Amino acid sequence: MRYPNGIKKEYKSIHSHSNRGMNLEQDLNDSNNYYLINDIAIIYKKPTPITINKVDYKSRVDAVIKEAHFKTPSTTDYNGIYKGKYIDFEDKETKNTTSFPLNNIHKHQIEHLKKIYKHGGIGFIIVRFTKLNKTYLLFIEDLINFLNNNERVSIPISYFKEFGHIIKEGLNPRLDYLKILDQKGV
């Protein structure tokens, strides 16, 4: 568009084609909602514990949190129960196409998943390689095996292909990751 003073108006696209689908967290929330509605499993996203320091009260309805901080480091993103077993997992996305950087998952989260496994629960991570449009489930025992036997700072995609489990996308549930637990014999 040309304005009277000759300056061209540039329009910037607000749409990104780098992630055309929904993000991983939304896909998992939709899947978990499907599992809940159909009485398959009860799995919830854990709230992140915060302490509120400052609130702007324009009115009771329009209160806005202006300043807050995390109370404690969060453990993992999701937990629940499936077929009488406690499950706990973390979800992560990466734009990398060759590996998953280990700095994307915190040490305390890995320690938490190790404890879940030690006590008979099912722990895993779900990793989406966004540019490849591939989502993998990697059980904590396979993650521990990798960490104990490698000095790398990232997990190569080849490790996910060999030891992880691809999660196929569908309509309902969007990501049927519980099918992988069934295949493992949970």
Enumerate the language-model features and the residues they cover.
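Short, electropositive alpha-helical surface patch
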Residues: 137-160
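Acidic-basic catalytic patches of nuclease active cores, encompassing PD-(D/E)XK
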Residues: 1-2, 8-66
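Short, solvent-exposed loop/turn segments at secondary-structure junctions
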Residues: 52-53, 96-99, 133
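Short connector loops at helix/strand junctions that flank enzyme active sites
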Residues: 71-75, 82-86, 118-120
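Nucleic-acid nuclease catalytic cores
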Residues: 114-144
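Mg2+/Mn2+-dependent nuclease catalytic core
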Residues: 92-115, 119
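Charged phosphate-binding loop/patch that engages nucleotide di/tri-phosphates or the phosphate backbone
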Residues: 2-15, 20, 160-186
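Conserved catalytic cores of phosphodiester-cleaving nucleases, focusing on short active-site segments
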Residues: 77-97
